Amino acid sequence: MIEHGNSTFDYRSIREVAANAGAGATAGAIAATFVCPLDVIKTRLQVLGLPEAPASGQRGGVIITSLKNIIKEEGYRGMYRGLSPTIIALLPNWAVYFSVYGKLKDVLQSSDGKLSIGSNMIAAAGAGAATSIATNPLWVVKTRLMTQGIRPGVVPYKSVMSAFSRICHEEGVRGLYSGILPSLAGVSHVAIQFPAYEKIKQYMAKMDNTSVENLSPGNVAIASSIAKVIASILTYPHEVIRAKLQEQGQIRNAETKYSGVIDCITKVFRSEGIPGLYRGCATNLLRTTPSAVITFTTYEMMLRFFRQVVPPETNRSDDRRREEERKNLVSRRGEEEDKDLGLRESQTQSNKISTPHIPLGSK
């Protein structure tokens, strides 16, 4: 602990935030790179619907057909459209999420250090809302870059900064926050995923007779995949609505198709029914499940690594405090011994003065 006047600066919280942010960003970047082609396909399915059916007429070839179309029309580079803003967005995304999530859990936990499911959901939702507001512009850019290759008559963005500049110039700040309402509605996803993930980890730790911090990577992978599937299925429709709203401003001088969230939901439901709200869900699960496994497993392992590399400041503070207490104790003991010695010497001198000398042989 570092003291400044009456205020106390908790270095441990800074260390934990840095460790969480570093581990999360590393894990997210690895996962994003691995599953980017599926992310491109999912985004295009959400915005444009199904690709042209293969000539063979076989069913179940949506992903393969989409990949072939992308490679044929845009090359292998097309499979990684939007990767740069995705990775750039993940850095503040995880930094904001885990720092806010950790702080809210500390605030909401009971006096005995336990966190109820309801409090965990509130913490996860609050962190999700803060993250959505902070990073929405980057996700808008990512969506535009992923879909621009298949929009006729669209002047393509040259880079991430080019996309930012043009969106601000042509649509204003509002364009960077298109789709923010369904994004905020999407906090229900993390409000389900994170509490479920932690409960599953606790169950597995209990079954293995170990602590949550010492779970094996395999158990972490299982817990993260189950939690992700549950949350994705329950909350997927908001992703479709968000993608449609984020993408529609890209076509110049085109009539706005959706006036808002409610209008978008109504039109999608009328034209496509419930399946329209789950368009791309299977692809999304194929993308998000391994992504969650990679992200959470890497995150947990990197977090343990960072905690080992950077020992808790509180431990060093405790060591210094114990050393100071030991020195003070030794000093006090020395002072007490000096006082005792002085007292004994004074008593000896007093005895010598007060005791008369009686010569031997006197009567």
From Swiss-Prot:
Gene3D superfamilies xref list: Mitochondrial carrier domain
Cleaved signal peptide residues: none
Segments annotated as Solcar repeats: 15-107, 115-203, 215-305
Known tissue expression: Highly expressed in young meristematic shoot area, vascular bundles of leaves, developing siliques including the funiculi, petal veins, developing pollen and central cylinder of roots.
Mode of membrane association: Multi-pass membrane protein
Main localisation: mitochondrion
Biased composition (Polar residues): 345-354
InterPro entries: Mit_carrier, Mitochondrial_sb/sol_carrier, Mt_carrier_dom_sf, SLC25A32-like
Residue ranges of the region described as Disordered: 313-363
GO molecular function terms listed in the Swiss-Prot or TrEMBL record: antiporter activity; NAD transmembrane transporter activity
Protein keywords: Antiport, Membrane, Mitochondrion, Repeat, Transmembrane, Transmembrane helix, Transport
GO cellular component, one term: mitochondrial membrane
Compositionally biased spans, kind Basic and acidic residues: 315-343
GO biological process, one term: NAD transport
Annotated compartments: Mitochondrion membrane
Activity control: Inhibited by pyridoxal 5'-phosphate, bathophenanthroline, tannic acid, mersalyl, mercuric chloride, p-hydroxymercuribenzoate, p-hydroxymercuribenzoate sulfonate, bromocresol purple and N-ethylmaleimide.
Residues passing through the membrane, by range: 21-41, 82-102, 121-141, 176-196, 215-235, 277-299
Record function comment: Mediates the NAD(+) import into chloroplast. Favors the NAD(+)(in)/ADP or AMP(out) antiport exchange, but is also able to catalyze a low unidirectional transport (uniport) of NAD(+).
Other known facts: Appears to be a mitochondrial envelope-located membrane protein lacking an N-terminal-located transit peptide.
Protein family (similarity comment): Belongs to the mitochondrial carrier (TC 2.A.29) family.
Name this protein carries in UniProt: Nicotinamide adenine dinucleotide transporter 2, mitochondrial
Provenance organism: Arabidopsis thaliana (Mouse-ear cress)
